[in-house]
């Protein structure tokens, strides 16, 4: 609930949170607040009226002025009382097999698209399917960034484009790019060696054998390769992660607003070192899982002003009405 009910007892906060987050009656609420228990199926707005608190939904996420354009602040706040889904991206050729395995294990799922399934968040799929080989656990909005990558790869008119995932982290987007075009000449980098070790294991499961893994700190200017080396650069940069806080709601209470500027400075350093590696006519894709404009639209302005790339497309991927994360993606082209 963020800081929306600061002047109440801990017990009252717990009971209120349980009521707001429950979608069906339960024994705990029946014991503590029976008059609320049979009203769990009501909407968040109706529940807020019932509790008769000075709880302002807008104060769940009090940084409204920092939000990217187009985000409905009230709907975004309401989404924190709904458990996000677990999303699977089905790998090419494995779609039917995965669905059959889930059905046999009596695991409920909803078909979002041909390659995307939504499951209850607590679903145990590890023992049912071969993760990374048959399907990848990947949020819906993160999967949507694949559409931008697909268009970018197609625009390069090269069956084996050189691609650099410069902030590879868990490698989900690299696997997705490989599924879009298995012929890509893939380079992944991260500042942490442990990440590259884990990537190697994950790529082995995913069947990705031909790639380069490089330890690189993009906060500094030193690189293990020359400039203008890649046709496509993906920068899924470190950020506040504010678009994912439905999965880590404690951030609503503990987040320090000064961290927005801290990450903004870091993002400028990363893109300033990554963009020079882009070939003429190449494509640069900037991605965050943030809802803050300083990390999103203001970074687009920074890139346009300092590197003179052409903005092809940018979009806030609103996941708050889909039980998913919210993200931001911008696509640029380096003209000749």
Task: Locate the predicted segments by residue.
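S-adenosylmethionine
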Residues: 1-336
């Amino acid at each position: 609930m963020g800081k929306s009910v600061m002047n109440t007892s801990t017990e009252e906060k717990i009971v209120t949170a349980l009521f707001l987050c429950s979608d069906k009656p339960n024994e705990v609420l029946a014991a503590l607040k029976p008059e609320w228990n049979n009203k769990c199926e009501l909407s968040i707005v109706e529940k807020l009226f019932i509790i008769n608190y000075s709880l302002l939904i807008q104060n769940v996420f009090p940084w409204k002025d920092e939000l990217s354009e187009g985000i409905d602040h009230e709907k975004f706040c309401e989404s924190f009382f709904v458990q996000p889904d677990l999303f699977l991206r089905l790998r090419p050729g494995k779609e039917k097999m995965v669905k059959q395995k889930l059905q046999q294990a009596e695991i409920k799922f909803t078909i979002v698209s041909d390659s995307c399934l939504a499951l209850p968040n607590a679903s145990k799929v590890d023992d049912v399917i071969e993760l990374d080989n048959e399907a990848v656990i990947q949020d819906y909005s993160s999967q949507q960034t694949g559409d931008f990558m697909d268009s970018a790869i197609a625009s390069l008119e090269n069956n084996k484009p050189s691609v650099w995932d410069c902030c590879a982290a868990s490698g989900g987007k690299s696997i997705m790019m490989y599924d879009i075009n298995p012929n890509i000449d893939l380079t992944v980098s991260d500042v942490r060696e442990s990440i590259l070790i884990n990537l190697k294991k994950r790529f082995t499961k995913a069947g990705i054998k031909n790639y380069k893994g490089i330890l690189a700190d993009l906060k500094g200017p030193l690189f293990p390769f020359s400039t203008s080396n890649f046709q496509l650069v993906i920068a899924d940069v470190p950020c506040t992660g504010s678009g994912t806080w439905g999965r880590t709601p404690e951030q609503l209470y503990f987040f320090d607003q000064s961290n927005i500027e801290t990450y903004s400075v870091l993002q400028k350093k990363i893109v300033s070192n990554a963009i020079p590696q882009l070939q003429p006519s190449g494509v640069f894709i900037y991605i965050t899982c943030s809802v803050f404009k300083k990390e999103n639209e203001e970074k687009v302005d920074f890139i346009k002003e300092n590197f003179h790339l052409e903005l092809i497309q940018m979009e806030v991927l609103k996941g708050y009405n889909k039980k998913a994360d919210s993200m931001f993606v911008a696509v640029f082209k380096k003209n000749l």
